[in-house]
Amino acid sequence: MKRICILKGSPRKDGNTNTLLKPFINRFESEGYICDTFDLHDMDIRPCMACRTCQQDQTVFGCCYDDDMDKIFDSIMSSDLIVLASPIYSWYCTPPMKMVLDRLVYGMNKYYGEGEEKPALWAGKKVAVLTTCGYRPEKGADLFEEGIKRYCKHSQLKFCGMLAERHLGYDTVFFDDEKAQRAVEFAEKLSCRLQHKELEI
């Protein structure tokens, strides 16, 4: 059974990013995928302190904190795709998403300890980004996309693409049929990628 881990960084349950996610998730579920979704704002997730406790055991996540990150770790390790879904705040993701990324880059990548072997526990996992922003995506979401591309390269992950949709302002309607269709098409392309079909995203 194919499984997807979806990390939701929006503080608003009915905000633009979560609205865009609905047809995206529905498309995957219609194909039989299991979608694990995590509302990061509702979870107990603490910031990385760079203590390197996680580097002492190269086989487990191993963080010193006893919080909800273990749930995310377990989901990621059993998933075929990781989806980072966040609105853009100051040209990057929201603070809870950034905390998760910081915790994962240490806990998953055993590059920083004393052991001779330095594995990436999640090497080969596929990553996609779904985001919303106020500027045109090429000016509003480009830094986040580039950051995640570098993050993936560092972590031996496979970046599979980004869907970014613009909102023109709080006095305008964000969601429409065209955005819904693009979300569905993005899900379809990612599904093809997961099935090892050659397809540009």
Each model region followed by its residue ranges:
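Hydrophobic anchor at the start of a short beta-strand
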Residues: 35, 159-160
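N-terminal beta1-alpha1-beta2 submodule of the flavodoxin-like/Rossmannoid cofactor-binding fold
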Residues: 1-86, 90-109, 114, 170-201
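Short, glycine-/small-residue-rich phosphate/pyrophosphate-handling segment
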Residues: 113-155
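Beta-strand-loop-alpha "switch" segments that mediate conformational coupling across diverse proteins
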Residues: 161-166
